[in-house]
UniProtKB/Swiss-Prot annotation:
Family statement: Belongs to the type-II 3-dehydroquinase family.
Native source species: Leptothrix cholodnii (strain ATCC 51168 / LMG 8142 / SP-6)
PANTHER family xref list: CATABOLIC 3-DEHYDROQUINASE (PTHR21272:SF3)
Pathway: Metabolic intermediate biosynthesis; chorismate biosynthesis; chorismate from D-erythrose 4-phosphate and phosphoenolpyruvate: step 3/7
The protein's name in its UniProt record: 3-dehydroquinate dehydratase
Cross-referenced SUPFAM superfamilies: Type II 3-dehydroquinate dehydratase
Length: 149
């Protein structure tokens, strides 16, 4: 089972930006935890981060070509306005799980709306790194349920 984890704009700065919202964990540390959990769950986890919207869209297109089993995405600020990322994700035939370290619904009003939510199977927000770990578990469960038919 292949799970693709996508991290959007500014998320490479985890550990350096706003520790009140995001804690001090780095993206590399999050990736390590996801790899370890993926191994426990029988999933191979691939990681991609970009601060460039076109690069992110191209990686999502490649995920379609590669026929990945599920996508876990934290699009960062793109969550709230990038119809380009949303439309690229809509091409995928696999489950999409949206995750956020902070509770986007308890922050600034512009963060309350996600353009990705309507095409995602679910959204997990506000639990720090555990949002990613719960998201990975959810993605694996969705893939396993689909295979069990």
């Amino acid at each position: 089972m292949n799970i693709l984890v996508l991290n959007g704009i500014n998320l490479n700065m985890f550990g350096k930006r706003d520790p009140k919202q995001y804690g001090t964990i780095t993206l590399a540390q999050i990736d390590e935890q996801l790899d370890a959990l993926g191994a426990e769950l029988g999933a191979t986890v691939q990681h991609f981060q970009s601060n460039h919207e076109g690069e992110m869209a191209e990686r999502i297109h490649q995920a379609h070509v590669d026929n990945v089993d599920a996508v876990l995405i934290n699009a960062g600020a793109w969550t709230h306005y990038s119809y380009g990322i949303r439309d690229a994700l809509a091409i995928l035939k696999c489950p999409i799980v949206e995750v956020h370290m902070s509770n986007i619904h308890a922050r600034e009003p512009f963060r309350h709306h996600s353009v990705i939510a309507e095409i995602a199977r679910g959204q997990i927000a506000g639990f720090g790194v555990d949002s990613y770990l719960m998201g990975l578990r959810a993605a694996v469960n969705l893939v396993n349920a689909a295979k069990a038919g």
